[in-house]
């Protein structure tokens, strides 16, 4: 079957891999000049299986309001001038109940754990380098109230059987020796040994090469202008330079899934949530992180690749613009310099900001639509890297008409018609 995949980020290219593995004739189009050029370009690098958690949770609205007024707020809200931003926030607030949290958490954990297994199988099948490490996540707390608040998270970890260890300040250095220099700034920690790290862009670029070896055709610099359909099925996707006829379409366009599919009268509940990162060269390996450290106060992650440190995180709701405000860059620099002052060279840091495709319930949109041959793999929010292989395998199985290995019927767009 001819399958056209829209989008060449980690979600799209991972979908391509499994579709090609299933024997389909796959073509990919993307508006940029290569793979992983937008959301997948420079994220924090965390494979956060243990911290797969909905943004929408009981108490979050109050916490979010308090954080808005910090000197270095982890969350920013700027009206984008449209009503949809307010509509999306209202839908998110509706998911901040204990009942909805449990439903959404279960769905997300299901995908993430499946994704962990897909990564394991993939690594057994290929010999790909993406500077991955399996040394866990260390969450550090600077204030005692953060330790108290983490008790709720720990209860969730226990409920879902996620291994963890609570740490005293001095014990944090067991996992991140460089933190021994700054123990006085930490009041506690939480270690999740089953988490991992890796460069999402490097993974996607290398997977792209493997897909090419399987005969997949990639067309870049393709802006979608029209989707030709008969009301039931997609016949072709037209760009400014060509027409791509197909038997099936997979939409993996991240934040732009909503705008592109709007012409089909499909209302995808996705909003772009901006994040930022700095990437700096390691200058002193002993002073750099070993794996990844999540600073709870600033909501910033510091991740070690081979010879680089990636500092990323925070969130801004301001529409589709991708400018990195100087104040946010200062926050990233402050955190890495505070915890790992001898680890890297900030004067050589590369700045980046990108848009995460967030749904109100934090769960991606995977599966069928009302068009018989249009499928979704989008809306992963901050967990696109973590969930990429699991979501992609689910998508490929659904497109192929196969039974999925885990439950997937509650991941499609139709769940929003039931709220």
From Swiss-Prot:
GN (gene name): dadA
Name of this chain's protein: D-amino acid dehydrogenase
Cofactor: FAD
Gene Ontology terms describing biological process: D-alanine catabolic process
Residue spans crossing the bilayer: none
Keyword Flavoprotein part of the UniProt annotation: yes
Family: Belongs to the DadA oxidoreductase family.
Pathway in which this enzyme or protein is active: Amino-acid degradation; D-alanine degradation; NH(3) and pyruvate from D-alanine: step 1/1
Native source organism of the sequence: Neisseria gonorrhoeae (strain ATCC 700825 / FA 1090)
């Amino acid at each position: 079957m001819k399958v056209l995949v829209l989008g060449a980020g980690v979600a799209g290219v991972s979908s391509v891999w499994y579709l090609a593995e299933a024997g389909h004739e796959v073509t990919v189009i993307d508006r940029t000049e290569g793979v992983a050029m937008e959301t997948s370009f420079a994220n924090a690098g965390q494979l956060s299986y243990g911290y797969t958690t909905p943004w929408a949770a009981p108490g979050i609205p109050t916490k979010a309001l308090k954080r808005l007024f910090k000197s270095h707020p982890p969350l920013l809200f700027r009206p984008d001038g449209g009503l949809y931003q307010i509509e999306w926030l209202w839908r998110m607030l509706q998911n901040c109940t204990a009942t909805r949290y449990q439903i959404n958490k279960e769905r997300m954990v299901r995908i993430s754990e499946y994704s962990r297994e897909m990564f394991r199988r993939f690594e057994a099948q290929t010999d790909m380098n993406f500077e991955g490490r399996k040394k866990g996540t260390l969450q550090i707390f600077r204030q005692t109230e953060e330790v108290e608040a983490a008790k709720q998270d720990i209860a969730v970890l226990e409920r879902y059987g996620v291994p963890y260890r609570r740490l005293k300040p001095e014990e944090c250095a067991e996992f991140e020796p460089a933190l021994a220099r700054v123990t006085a700034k930490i009041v506690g920690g939480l270690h999740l040994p089953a988490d991992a790290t890796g460069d999402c862009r490097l993974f996607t670029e290398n997977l792209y090469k493997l897909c090419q070896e399987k005969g997949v055709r990639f067309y870049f610099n393709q802006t979608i202008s029209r989707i030709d359909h008969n009301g039931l099925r997609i016949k072709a996707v037209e760009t400014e330079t060509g027409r791509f006829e197909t038997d099936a379409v997979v939409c993996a366009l991240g934040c732009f899934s909503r705008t592109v599919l709007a012409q089909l009268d499909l209302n995808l509940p996705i909003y772009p949530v901006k994040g930022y990162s700095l990437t700096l060269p390691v200058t002193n390996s002993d002073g750099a992180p070993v794996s990844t450290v999540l600073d709870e106060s600033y909501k910033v992650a510091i991740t070690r690749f081979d010879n680089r440190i990636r500092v990323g995180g925070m969130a801004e709701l301001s529409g589709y613009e991708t400018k990195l405000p100087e104040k946010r860059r200062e926050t990233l620099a402050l955190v890495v310099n505070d915890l790992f002052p001898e680890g890297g060279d900030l004067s050589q840091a590369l700045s980046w900001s990108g848009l995460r495709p967030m749904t109100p319930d934090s769960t991606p949109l995977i599966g069928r639509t009302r068009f018989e041959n249009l499928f979704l793999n989008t809306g992963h929010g901050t967990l696109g890297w973590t969930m990429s292989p699991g979501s992609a395998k689910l998508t490929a199985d659904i497109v192929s008409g196969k039974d999925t290995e885990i439950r997937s019927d509650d991941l499609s767009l139709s769940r929003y018609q039931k709220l």
